[in-house]
């Protein structure tokens, strides 16, 4: 059935969905999974294929009136946990945030690593997650608790040793199906794919990639931004004109043990460079929710709120939520 694909021919959406469902079943061999992931790595993924993969792995839950801010990782920038910090800031400003994330697979410091260190207890079901979201405006869903089929790919992904399509599929599989998404990608070729999935799925989304490779809005390079609603538009942000010069050592570290402290001090406003970086990446969350009309307004509102101490107090609340 899949011989033509293995020779490089693109698949339609339905065939791609069938293929991913088969690969996510115990009947599929690791050799076949490795072959498919390798072909996709070499020739790339079409929008129809990505849509089929998404539909195969995404549980058909009701859409949640909330926002997720997530990055693909893989940029090797070793920055603080900025999307998680931005999610906390946005929720402390009154927005409903359903954050989806994982631990680091690269030996650095992932979003779930940071949340664990705050004392946060991950919800184990969508029902529990929705209750948390209702109580506090914030919930963090730990990806392996909800993407159990991904465990079948673990051995193959480790053996292959390169990022596969699953690295880019996982971040958009939030089981609460938030209607609004801010998605950062380290691979610019996935921007149009994410925009296509968002448009075809009825999401509102902001897709972003920075020219220095960050899957965040970088303070050191221009960021390309795609805005998705009924239509897709594009813009660019020169973040340095908003933040001023930032010291890299205040927002990034090759030492995983230092990342949590830098992230926490940014949320508290003690690390001003970190706070500016977090405010910069909170801006698109405010924009997509109608709380800011542009990046400058969103950045300034988020930074003022961080420096007021609101996010630091809010973090104490969600860390104790059970």
Swiss-Prot record:
Residues holding Mg(2+) 2: 215-216
Biological process (GO), any one: L-tryptophan biosynthetic process
Entry coiled-coil feature ranges: none
Domain of life: Archaea
Matching InterPro entries: Anthranilate_Pribosyl_Tfrase (IPR005940), Glycosyl_Trfase_fam3 (IPR000312), Glycosyl_Trfase_fam3_N_dom (IPR017459), Glycosyl_Trfase_fam3_N_dom_sf (IPR036320), Nuc_phospho_transferase (IPR035902)
Residue numbers binding anthranilate 1: 71, 102
Family statement: Belongs to the anthranilate phosphoribosyltransferase family.
Protein name, per record: Anthranilate phosphoribosyltransferase
Species for this entry: Thermoplasma acidophilum (strain ATCC 25905 / DSM 1728 / JCM 9062 / NBRC 15155 / AMRC-C165)
Name of the gene encoding the protein in the UniProt record: trpD
